[in-house]
Amino acid sequence: MYFCQMFLRMIKKALLIVGMLTVTLSCSEYQKLLKSDDTAQKYTRAEELYNQGIEKDSDKSLKRSLRLLEQIEPQFRGKPQGQRLAYMVANAHYQLEDYYLAPFEFERFLQLYPNSDKAEEAEFKMAASYFYRSPKYNLDQTDTHKGIEKLQIYLNKYPDGEYSDKANEMATALQTKLEKKAFEIAKQYHKTQYYKAAIASFNNFLADNPGSPFREEAYFYRFDSAYLLAINSFQVLMEERLKEAKDFYETYKKYYPEGQYLPQMKDALEDINNRLQNF
């Protein structure tokens, strides 16, 4: 029994050593290949590593492939293999979630090979890169605007394309993020008691975003801003502002007759009506 255990340990150690030697040799061969001038061998190995990276979702293989691809791709432009190599460079960046280089490479691919059978995929992934780059709503939204623009270009070119459903979902999500930003800016004016600015911001928001999921809440905060502005106004301004707040209440009720904010709005409305009796 003891000798069996010893034998098994020796086998495990031997296998481990063989594995380590294989990895070392593999790394050494790869480094030699990087420094060599053998373009054909680089092409073959780059494609092997790329396919391995895609099939096994291996970042390591994709990164290795990319280093080789970037060395040889310029040499194949205008040749039959050029299109394949340019696509692999762009898609490797995309699969590695490098959403800053990926759209640049896909755009270059489309400029070089506009009639490629990979054109639709490249157009979508270029647009999707901006979607993944888009930050939280409270940060700068340049990439969000760019993403909407690029997704719309894709949808215009391929209205029934393979990725059209996903592109629509992404565009909607980005648009909602922009609406969230605009809504929160207006809401911040309300919170900090800049009621005039809040009313103006909510008016703009409602005019610009007719289908927004934040629309009901915007109507409520517009009313509440107008009400709070009115009751804190000088007497000479109060009547006009109370009437405006009442109009905002009626607008909310028209669009949301069973709205979630009606109970608290009715209390404010009663106060408005009582105050208006003094004029």
Features from the language model and the residues they span:
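Acidic, polar-rich low-complexity tracts and alpha-helical solenoid repeat scaffolds
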Residues: 2-7, 11, 26-279
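Bacterial N-terminal signal peptides
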Residues: 17-24
